[in-house]
Regions:
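Short glycine/serine-rich loop/turn segments
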Residues: 1-32, 91-93, 143, 230-248
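Short acidic, glycine/serine/threonine-rich loops at helix termini
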Residues: 2-7, 24-25, 100-103, 134-138, ...
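Conserved active-site and cofactor/substrate-binding residues in soluble primary-metabolism enzymes
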Residues: 5-8, 40-47, 65, 102-110, ...
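Short, solvent-exposed loop/turn segments at the edges of secondary structure
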Residues: 6-8, 15, 30-33, 83, ...
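A short helix-breaking turn/cap at a secondary-structure junction
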Residues: 11-106, 111, 169-174
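Glycine-rich, small-residue loops and helix-cap segments
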Residues: 114, 118, 122, 132, ...
Length: 291
């Protein structure tokens, strides 16, 4: 949600994991999936979240925490009554990543300086795990996807081929080849590979360990700071079909957004900036779970 929101100049909100029921959603990666919100205004995002959030007897992963009156909390008088300048962190490595557009870097740095001038405490902190985020995310999500999407076999779920079939395996093969797009097939194959006996410990187990390190790090950061800020995406929107030849390039566009998914915290992309190429781009704001 945050990446397309950034590209299109709108607000994109990913709530905390478990804030909104996933009942009715096709499961992709169950420990990551969270329904998000696109909106033109913060008020709309708050109102929609207030309506959608909360317990659901059909989803065991949804949180039972009470749903705050988000739409009331963001009214100006409430903000003025309860808000003081925050302690804000940003990961140094996010602004020095070689893939980050120099103009995006400059505008984010300028914004951080503006916050400091307004009385916010803004501090850079080290984040040595940045380069691990995308590999960890894709190892774990594709592993979960290969399991979740195995139910679409043409018998109990989903599309069923109309071609003549020789046996059950032939039914599976033709059905899944027709029913899944190229990118979905790529992710299923990658997930099946990392879960295979010879590679489970080398990839899946190590990715789980990195995820736990990230959770621990996040807990430490939010014990000292209220917010983490970063660019949402390293570049503005690229041309249609421009990166189709390189799955790796496409995956790396997620370098700033997957962190919140890995650790389950809420994150929002706010469209604050316009690039000299005329395209919008946003600031990503993250806070502790359910904050």
């Amino acid at each position: 949600v945050r990446q397309p929101a950034d590209f299109c100049g709108v607000i994109g909100l990913k709530p905390s994991y478990g804030r909104i029921s996933r009942y009715g959603l096709i499961a992709y990666a169950s420990s990551f999936d969270q329904i998000g919100i696109f909106s033109k205004t913060i008020e709309d995002a708050a109102l929609v979240l207030e309506v959608m959030a909360g317990e659901d007897e059909f989803d065991s992963t949804v949180s039972s925490k009470p749903v705050p009156p988000y739409s009331k909390l963001i009214e100006r008088k409430e903000i003025e009554k309860t808000t003081s300048p925050k302690k804000v962190a940003y990961f140094k490595e996010t602004l020095f990543h070689p893939g980050l557009d120099p103009e995006i870097k400059t505008k984010i740095e300028s914004y951080l300086n503006d916050l400091t001038a307004k009385g916010y405490i803004v501090e850079a902190i080290d984040f040595s795990l940045l380069s691990y985020l995308v590999p960890t995310y894709y190892v774990l999500t594709t592993a979960e996807a290969s399991s979740n999407l195995s139910r679409f076999d043409g018998i109990k779920f989903g599309h069923r081929t109309k071609q003549s079939i020789a046996d059950l395996n032939d039914l599976y093969k033709k059905t899944r080849t027709e029913g899944f797009g190229e990118e979905v097939q790529r992710r299923i194959l990658l997930g099946s590979f990392v879960l295979s006996a010879g590679y489970f410990d080398a990839y899946f187990t190590k990715a789980q360990q990195v995820r736990q390190k990230l959770v621990d790090l996040t807990s430490t950061v939010f014990s000292k700071y209220d917010l983490i800020l970063s660019p949402t995406v390293p570049t503005t929107a690229f041309g249609l079909g421009e990166r189709n030849h390189s799955a790796t390039e496409m995956f790396l566009a997620d370098i700033y957004t997957v962190y919140a998914n890995l650790v389950g915290i809420p994150a929002i992309s706010i469209p604050l900036f316009t690039h000299s190429n005329g395209m919008p781009f946003g600031l990503q704001v993250m806070s502790a779970s359910f904050n």
